[in-house]
């Protein structure tokens, strides 16, 4: 008799185009896992991690991303950042200052590259509940420049008083988080909501005190005490850009997709397992609208989840769902699966289909 794992793998294989197969997690490399002490001064807390990486690689990544993603009038942004540094959100601006000084970059370029990441994160996120009421959360992060970013991806354990306060996955030099977990409380991921990117509006909102979307994830992981509090903070805090926040908790039913406008929530889409809605899939499109045929990652993910079945759901099964092409694609940088109820099982793997 075949084991449930073998049956699941065979079912997923049927969903794939020729030549595309799930990648077992143990065959995909894990990123470095590093510690960042929040008890250290903001300007110094990333320095031990930075010393583990080639500074030339990091400077090259900044130059490439800024050159490709940032408007030609970035000099104007640089002047604004220099003049308004003391008014920008903390501790993040001080952290960027410390990183920039270490890499011999201007604060403006360090700041701009952090904002550039906010604009281009294409993603797939899934929050789901198994038949026993356990909550699982997974995400793929897709981004151009994968040749650089795969070398810069890290799992970060943020420490307070020597203990893990929360965990997140990010790129070296980027102080925000698109993926994270507060142990025994909640998990969260962010997916870009593309409403047309206007740097002018983003900068204006920033100087009005609105939060970058990835900084709010990190703040929420640091400050919110439970699933409900995290959803409220993620739904209500003014932002510099639209986004989808996907949140998973520890109790049955604790899973939601929050569709955000800059000023507040556009939609709240919770799990509804009693009525058969045991998972939610969010890519980069409003869930109540059809996805464009040119970028349909939603349908393959839904098919893979239904093929898996609620009774067979696990972190490994969710990893396989996120391995189905085109959910996993040539610009997928990493996959993370997590469950706040079992925080030690937080797992990230680097993907490289190119």
UniProtKB/Swiss-Prot annotation:
- One Pfam short name: NAAA-beta
What happens to this protein after translation, modification-wise? Answer: N-glycosylated. Tunicamycin treatment causes a reduction in specific activity against N-palmitoylethanolamine.
Q: Name the enzyme's class.
A: hydrolase
- Point out the glycosylated residues in this chain: 35, 104, 306, 312, 352
Q: Which family does it belong to?
A: Belongs to the acid ceramidase family.
Q: How does it sit in the membrane?
A: Peripheral membrane protein
**Transmembrane parts of this sequence:** none
Per the UniProt record, the source organism is Cavia porcellus
Q: What is this protein called?
A: N-acylethanolamine-hydrolyzing acid amidase
Query: Keyword Transcription, does the record have it?
Result: no
Query: According to the UniProt entry, where is the signal peptide?
Result: 1-22
Q: Which gene encodes it?
A: NAAA
Keyword tags: Autocatalytic cleavage, Fatty acid metabolism, Glycoprotein, Hydrolase, Lipid degradation, Lipid metabolism, Lysosome, Membrane, Signal, Zymogen
Origin: domain of life? Eukaryota
Enumerate the residues marked as the site Important for enzyme activity.
139, 284
- GO process annotations (BP): fatty acid metabolic process; lipid catabolic process; N-acylethanolamine metabolic process; N-acylphosphatidylethanolamine metabolic process; sphingosine metabolic process
Q: Write out the GO cellular component annotations.
A: lysosome; membrane
Give the catalytic activity. N-hexadecanoylethanolamine + H2O = ethanolamine + hexadecanoate; an N-(long-chain fatty acyl)ethanolamine + H2O = a long-chain fatty acid + ethanolamine; N-dodecanoylethanolamine + H2O = dodecanoate + ethanolamine; N-tetradecanoylethanolamine + H2O = tetradecanoate + ethanolamine
* EC annotation from Swiss-Prot or TrEMBL: 3.5.1.60, 3.5.1.23
